[in-house]
Amino acid sequence: MTITSNISVQNDNLVVQGKTILTKIPDNIILTPVTGNGFVSGSFIGATFEQSKSLHVFPIGVLEGLRFMCCFRFKLWWMTQRMGSCGKDIPLETQFMLLESKDEVEGNGDDAPTVYTVFLPLLEGQFRAVLQGNEKNEIEICFESGDKAVETSQGTHLVYVHAGTNPFEVIRQSVKAVERHMQTFHHREKKKLPSFLDWFGWCTWDAFYTDVTAEGVDEGLKSLSEGGTPPKFLIIDDGWQQIENKEKDENCVVQEGAQFATRLVGIKENAKFQKSDQKDTQVSGLKSVVDNAKQRHNVKQVYAWHALAGYWGGVKPAASGMEHYDSALAYPVQSPGVLGNQPDIVMDSLAVHGLGLVNPKKVFNFYNELHSYLASCGIDGVKVDVQNIIETLGAGLGGRVSLTRSYQQALEASIARNFTDNGCISCMCHNTDGLYSAKQTAIVRASDDFYPRDPASHTIHIASVAYNSLFLGEFMQPDWDMFHSLHPTAEYHAAARAVGGCAIYVSDKPGNHNFDLLRKLVLPDGSVLRAKLPGRPTRDCLFADPARDGISLLKIWNMNKFTGIVGVFNCQGAGWCKETKKNQIHDTSPGTLTGSIRADDADLISQVAGEDWSGDSIVYAYRSGEVVRLPKGASIPLTLKVLEYELFHISPLKEITENISFAPIGLVDMFNSSGAIESIDINHVTDKNPEFFDGEISSASPALSDNRSPTALVSVSVRGCGRFGAYSSQRPLKCAVESTETDFTYDAEVGLVTLNLPVTREEMFRWHVEILV
């Protein structure tokens, strides 16, 4: 069978479905279609060079007049988003790019379908490719090994290009095509998600930073539990390990970041976590902390922090008891793209002091001994931080890709051996060296940290996690980070976590909590109502700039089992500045913005609605409490000030008869209200002809008689407690919970049925709710 592609080079232009995407393609550029039978949607861009070198920077064509969004590393550890329309707008260290164009084969002008084209720079052999732009509007590839001894004169599969009409499916299929080609990583859908995701958690970091102690852990768990939101997973962050005590060097120019050169001197816990009661010398202090958390506070999962290199400054060479890891001082060398973006205090420190790098041949032994000790203490997993440091240490070791892959493979092998629940959170890890080497790790931090004391950071954080999740969410479930429940932006952050599909955890100091807020996220049993997918921007937000353009709201969509959810956020006023190379507020008083939502903003709503869906929906707005019957194709307007939000739950309308329709809403006082719905079943219960009336059902329509014969029994399984809501076009004849008739209220103006579900002692309990209509 002949292979045909919708991506080709014609007259020195890169053409996608009839539309020129890039012009002036150089002669040394090679286009290779994906292998396979029939029509293919993807091709690889490669190149040949006159000289063999360890670093090549070269153009692949000119981009002008097409909107794009990209994810780029603004500093070594983290990505954020950038929007533009020409090559010079593409930042250094761009690892993902999505372009918008029109299909000029299938239509003309505005009638032509929109085509979305993904560019994924890849790893090839010992080299890594990234994109960047120049002042000529050329897209360049920066192709490097990170080791001057590792050279090449060609690369045949440097960037994968994939196109189609659904942007989310295009991204998904492009990563899956690269997975088949590279065979070095797995797509998120193939990975086991750790169970902690469905439980509320607490992290010690912003509560104590490195001053965390055993007593502090106990205080934090106790404080949250007493307020009715018990943490079921715990992260003991940086501060528990044995590290060297270094006096500051008076002659060292780098002082502020001196802590980052500190090295690990033992795999066990430090003195702060040692037992004060030494009656049982066989039990470690860390084990006592974990046992206390699980037995006294009913915590299910405990994770411990460590850096990929052991600690920020690695493992101290020849440290007592750690000699067998063959740690040696190495000095980081950053890639040109990273150096062109934001400087980092960690790297300033390590450039002076060096990092104690465990011999790559011994790194599995290091991880295995560390993790087996942690597992013996009852630890269930690890948060592995500072990962991208490894890419800077490849000189003399085969380069950045080889070194990163050896560390990642050793890490995943140790986690598989020691932690049965695939217990790993990957952090400070936004490089493709690691992403394209991860076959097992299933959780990735989605952005730079939550910074409670930085006013510029909060809108930036929400925008970054959403756009980064477009790319990262194909590899792992994005983690949108901890936040503070008692904070001026707490509700804004909480609402974002509800639509993010991510773990929900806080870093509150003991006693500093907003329990009214937390109870909108956390059920009394400590579980959470988590959306099912990575939260991502809606289609109409993909190429807008909701942090900088002054006009756009950010809309984030996700799915529950039977509904969609769309969160809308005003994120204007701050962003990463390419001139100052840091986050900054560029508008101190961003204006009030107006936008709208539609049912199909939740991109997969038709899949949960079923084949017989008319397109009409019931929309529940969480903050306002409004219930709206939304016809197919219609929209709901909204207005938000900066740092304001709204959550819309979209429930496809189920037509029971010509004049009776129904839609579940869920627990109306929870942020992710419709995430409580576990099942819905509608059974007709009469053969009699139901009463009919002429005209469309609306608030002005006459109600059917309460003495009518029942038409259908709607059965809904609901997880959680509190006020349960549903839409019914007619007042129900009766409602029951666990087969016992219960009181309910009915607002005939909007069709809202509400009833109360009691608290139960059983975890993850599902109430059986019956509504007779």
Swiss-Prot record:
Q: Does the keyword Glycosyltransferase apply?
A: yes
Q: Name one GO molecular function term.
A: glycosyltransferase activity
Keyword Nuclease annotated: no
Q: What EC designation does it have?
A: 2.4.1.82
Q: Which Gene3D superfamilies match?
A: Aldolase class I
What do we know about what induces or represses this protein's expression? Answer: By oxidative stress.
Q: Which biological processes are named by the entry's GO terms?
A: raffinose catabolic process; response to oxidative stress
Reactions this protein catalyses: alpha-D-galactosyl-(1->3)-1D-myo-inositol + sucrose = raffinose + myo-inositol
EC main group: transferase
InterPro entries noted in UniProt: Aldolase_TIM, Glycoside_hydrolase_SF, Glycosyl_hydrolases_36
Q: Which UniProt keywords apply?
A: Carbohydrate metabolism, Glycosyltransferase, Transferase
The protein's superkingdom reads Eukaryota
**GO terms for CC?**
plasmodesma
What does it do?
Transglycosidase operating by a ping-pong reaction mechanism. Involved in the synthesis of raffinose, a major soluble carbohydrate in seeds, roots and tubers.
Matching PANTHER family, A to Z?
A: GALACTINOL--SUCROSE GALACTOSYLTRANSFERASE 2-RELATED, PTHR31268
The entry assigns this protein to a family as follows:
Belongs to the glycosyl hydrolases 36 family.
**Protein name, UniProt field:** Probable galactinol--sucrose galactosyltransferase 2
Native source species:
Arabidopsis thaliana
